[in-house]
Design a protein with these regions (language model features):
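Ordered, soluble secondary-structure elements with a strong preference for glycine-centered loop motifs
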Residues: 2-5, 48, 52, 67, ...
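Charge-rich, well-structured scaffold segments of protease-associated domains
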Residues: 10-184, 240-380
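Active/ligand-binding-proximal structured segments within catalytic/core domains
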Residues: 1-14, 58-59, 215-226, 236
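His/Glu-based metal-binding/catalytic segments typifying zinc-dependent metallopeptidases
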Residues: 43, 150, 154, 159, ...
């Protein structure tokens, strides 16, 4: 958008000329004591000779935005609606999974409202009712966010370049406006069908495993490999005809299963619900378990480039993930056994009772199974 120094057309050219990109995204990180830290991440990269210009451009695109050009902002909103709708439809498995988690998980509630279906609906409503009052609220939001008192900075560079970049945190002013937490308002939805002009579905189901008495463990990474490769792939992909499927376990307690470009709906949910039965009877020889363990280790210990190292260190800093905790999880992975995997059967029996389902896709298929969903809406 327009800034105090650059107009709407000039700014992208400057960014492309002097940096490797300036991006922003919202995220929510859970700390090891269960608290949620909601942040707006701004990332930028540049060659050493362009560091000063990069700092100026970051300042312009965050703290020096010009909210007086209403028409330019309106065009940005329309462009964002178009791009976000395309992303949500093309990545329906991610969209549905995040939405299902948002029904009960505070962090994913924030994620949905700042980058998912909740955000998309907000943008559509903002475009429909765009006026001076809405513009003033956007300006107020920017002032609340871009405050030096709330800033955490992470830098990755060569040692000789550190002096050039170490004061980047000084670009923001201290504003002392305070915090606004309304964005965390709970979604009053249990299960949902979201209709799109599609012939297939993305089917996701989620639950909070901590409410079933379980805690996060490195063993869950091994369990994910087993379920992805041995159960879901066979039942949902091979036999069911979906293009993809998977599951995941989140530190905060969220667990979910999803399908990608799935011709089925009710059948897929039934497969999710029978995961406990599969685990009760699970067996594997030593070689197979070793392969599952190696796959899990690969997700926690892999080579990272400089940008990835910075992002990883930043997340661990905010979340309070220490080296001791990471080693504990490695040990849990390496000591995983068939018996450990079978012990999670009860967790999936609890998962089977969860009402939190999100299906994105075909209208006829969703309406035919409306007894599984307490809310049915159109994407747009």
């Amino acid at each position: 958008m327009d800034t105090q120094k650059y107009d709407f057309n000039e700014l992208p050219t400057k960014i492309d000329l002097y940096t490797g990109g300036i991006t922003s995204s919202c995220a929510a990180y859970y700390t090891t004591d269960g608290k949620v830290k909601k942040v707006l991440n701004v990332s930028a990269k540049a060659l050493s000779r362009n560091v000063e210009m990069m700092k100026e451009l970051v300042d312009q695109t965050t703290d020096k935005m010009d909210f007086d050009k209403a028409e330019s902002i309106r065009l940005i909103i329309k462009d964002r609606i178009s791009k976000l709708e395309n992303y949500l439809n093309q990545n329906g498995h991610i969209t549905a999974s995040n939405r299902a988690l948002s029904y009960f998980n505070e962090g994913y509630n924030y994620k949905d409202k700042t980058g998912g279906i909740g955000y998309f609906k907000f943008l559509c409503e903002l475009d429909k009712n765009f006026n001076d009052e809405a513009l003033a609220e956007l300006k107020k939001t920017a002032d609340i966010i871009f405050d030096k008192n709330k800033l955490t900075v992470g830098v990755s560079c060569e040692k000789n370049d550190f002096d050039k970049i170490k004061n980047i945190g000084q670009i923001f002013d201290a504003k002392d406006i305070g915090n606004k937490n309304g964005i965390s308002k709970k979604i009053n939805i249990v299960s949902e069908g979201i209709i799109t002009p599609s012939k297939i579905q993305y089917v996701a189901k989620a639950a909070d495993y901590k409410k079933a008495g379980y805690e996060y463990s490195g063993k869950l990474l091994v369990l994910k490999n087993i379920l992805d490769l041995e159960y879901l792939w066979n039942m949902v992909r091979v036999q069911g005809g979906a293009y993809g499927c998977g599951c995941n376990f989140i530190r905060s307690g969220g667990m979910y299963m999803y399908s990608y470009r799935d011709p089925n709906l009710k059948r897929t949910i039934g497969i999710y619900n029978k995961t406990g039965e599969f685990l009760e009877n699970f067996t594997a020889d030593g070689k197979a378990m070793t392969n599952y363990i190696i796959g899990a280790v690969n997700t926690v210990d892999r080579p990272l480039n400089m940008e990835q190292k910075l992002k990883t260190a930043f997340i661990r800093h905010i979340s309070g993930i220490t080296d001791c905790l990471r080693q504990k999880e490695r040990d849990e992975i390496l000591s995983s056994s068939c018996e450990d995997m079978r012990s999670y059967a009860q967790m999936f029996n609890y998962f089977a009772e969860s009402p939190h389902i999100c299906v994105i896709g075909n209208a006829d298929n969703i309406n035919n199974e409306k007894n599984l969903l307490n809310t049915i809406t159109a994407m747009k």
